Amino acid sequence: MLTLIDGNSLLFRAYYGVHSRLTRSDGTPTGAVYGFFNMILPILASANPDDKFVCIFDASRITFRQDIYPQYKMNRSETPADLITQGQMIQSGLMAIGMPVLCVPGVEADDVIATLATKNCTNTNATRIITSDKDLMQLVSDCVYLYDGMKSREIREAQVLEKFGVRPDQVIDVQSLMGDSSDNVPGVPGIGPKKAAELINQFGTLDNLYANLADVKNERIRGLLRDNREMAYISKQLVTLKTDVDLSDLNLAPFVFNTPSALEFIRTNVESNSLATKIEKLFPAEQFSAPAPEFTFPGNACEVPDIPPTPTPQPRREIKCTLITTIDELQNYLTKIDRFLAIDTETTGLNQISDKIVGISLAVNDIDGAYIPIRHRIKSNDLFGSDTTAPNQLTLETVYTYLWPILTNPNILKIGHNLKYDLHIMANEGWDTTKISPIDDTMLLSYILHGALHGHGLDELALKYLGHENIKFSSLFPPKTRDADMHFDQLEIKNAAPYAIEDACICYALYNMMRPELDSDDKLRHLYETCDLPLMPILMQIERNGVLADRNKLNQLSTIFHEQMQKLSDEIWQLSGHEFNIASPKQLGVILFDEMQLPANKKRSTDADSLNELIDTHPIVEKILNWRSIAKLAGTYADALPRQIASDGRIHTTYLQTSTNTGRLSSRDPNLQNIPIKTTLGEEIRKCFIAPPEHTLISVDYSQIQLRLLADIANIKTFRETFISGADIHEQTARKIFNIPTDQPVPREMRRAAKTVNFSIIYGISSFGLASQLGVSRAQAKQIIDSYMAGLPEIGKYIENTKKFATEHACVYTPWGRRIELPEIKNPRLRAYAIRAAINAPIQGFEADLMRRAMVEIANNIIKPNPDKIRMIMQVHDEMVFECRTEYATEFAQKIKSAMENIAQLSVPLVAEYVIAPIWGK
């Protein structure tokens, strides 16, 4: 029998289980490790000698499903640092006992499980999947069953029917309708599990349901299905597990438990006598001492680093907690402040534009904190009653009276963690946060010091720097409380205070450790103080400004997109000969490769790259690609953006300052960075962002910024001369590649080829990739690249020097000193990817540095003196967007252009271009 262990399912169950608080003697959390092995040991002990086992984990959060639906799983919070650490320990422990561990990039662990189970499903082979994940119930068949070890329960067809109300082969269609809030699968709004099962039982399949939509008697349900057809089929793509993951090189041998190695791991790294005793009892060393068969898989992306070294044992940090409920207590605590004050707000929710203060925590050092309760309430037990205000609290007005002089005192540094959020909350209360100064932020300090080496959440940093495990927010509430029901203002003050105070004290302690590290590097400190730190309050103001959105235009666009999708669907169905689900890769593969006999690659893939290779073989391919493009824009923007318009008619995105490796900003709710720039449909989306009456929008961006920075960083003489002279860089490149004399014009197709190479070479494009983009043979593409590199030898030198430095140091630097970490370069399986990233990283990072500093300069010198005339409302890639009174637009556009062009003195000129229009776009 083949047993597939769903590593993620067991890891999360163990992490949140009864042993979750266990630690080693040095304080390292081990509860999840203990729980994981405690669950699997009895299963392994019952195995037959010829049974095979493999444990599968996710390689990363990002998979092909985000290409289908970018919001997929984006509702999930940051993975706790101690969960990541324990996950790594578990993988090491599995290898120690002889268990193969498998991770495949680009897909989820569930897809790997589905592929292995399907391939193993023959008349003689049974597959058992150890999991508690309902998403795997679609795999249940005569030869595949699930096993929940915690409940000692097999899950076969009867149990699936009990759970979903349908057969296993119908589970996918039920999930397509009901969606899944935990994974952000949209489904059909208004249709829950019961109604979904009822519909699928009535019509058999999702396809048959939509083919007979008129037979749905309930008018409301029929309308929901009709209006959300595309979402249903997109959801089906998301919930359908792949069964064709390439595992051709995978070989599994019968499982052999290695007792000596297992005991060494448990005793050294988990320090659990009970687990060691259980292993000795179940797997006596005299019977289980043979080394396990070697397991290798070329595509394996499981990174199993060394177990974290044991730090010097430290006692748990003891924090003095002062609860402030009177003016005298507040005044007494504020007298303790010397030169530094850490501050944190507790709020009514997580909406930074509208939520209010519940309480404020302060810390005058790393072990002396205070909590000021302000708006705690007592929840009414009466369904129709209202909550009452908790006693013994200060009013916000009183707190403001005494705290505001401290916040605005130029001699006291105010320290926060993700301080931008706290400033938003204070602004919601009417506080003028522009006067809060000086400030610093431990999240930004962590980011500039260590970039992508680790996350920058407070809990993770506390564990990393201080060996301290913060109180978990969820632990303040009764077990099994839903996230939506966790309201801080309903907590008893005595329980809320230690949690709030700990955040402020830990922030203070982190500042004491990280700021000296930054101050030891003059170049990095200068970058931080002129770019990263001053940018934070500017981003806060951009978020508060928001951008006006045309709801009617978005709704019209949604209608147009869905009409275009229907028209394309009809054309695609006509070309194929019958209707099918265009959103289904499986059905699409059957249509293209079986029925229409189009050439298929080894994996019979229907992803965008594969279809682009087939675009000249049949007109249906281009129509399918167009349908997908429109479907993505409809689902992500035209349908979604109206729901994100606030009461002021504006969309208030959130800018993330610490989420990319290169220093680029990103955004969420919505993600403005993903709106296509150079497509007609993307332009239509941008037109929905508008100026209010008597105002216009100014959009300013850098021209050919990455090529100009490449010319400067790599010291490319030809590029520098071209940019200084103002000549056409792509035309000049074409002359070099194709040896075109200066007295002859450059043919359009040759300039296009040169432009493609110019913008692709710094991304490490191959001859195969260039051939695909240019529509030429690989031999021709190779000749173009060779000619390009020969004509511009400085680029080859830059690439080789960067590769060498990145390989030796696992990082690269921008000219202004930002360190871009490349930890993947140490992993042989990911090294090629990391090296390609290293080539472009200094350029992309320097572009981010320039943009950050330009935003600071423009905000301070142009926006701040003219708040009634102009304000910044968006930043997207190398573009800034402003809202300006119409009569001043040209004046300010020219000032902004000048500021951007003069932000740095390089060996080539920086050029900025602007557009003035009532809409975002041309």
Regions from the PLM with identified roles:
Residues 145, 167-170, 177-237, 247, ...:
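Accessory alpha-helical DNA-binding modules that contact the DNA backbone or grooves
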Residues 228-390, 437, 453, 465, ...:
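Conserved "right-hand" nucleotidyltransferase catalytic core of DNA-directed polymerases
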Residues 518-531, 535, 850, 854-876, ...:
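Active-site palm subdomain of RNA-directed nucleic acid polymerases
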Residues 486-489, 544, 648, 652-653, ...:
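Conserved catalytic core of nucleic-acid polymerases
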Residues 3, 7, 13-47, 54, ...:
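Conserved RNase H-like, two-metal-ion catalytic cores of nucleic-acid enzymes
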Residues 1-130, 134-156, 231-234, 240-248, ...:
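Noncatalytic, basic helical substrate-engagement surface that gates or grips nucleic-acid strands
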Residues 71-85, 141-166, 222, 371-394, ...:
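Short alpha-helix plus adjacent loop in nuclease-associated cores
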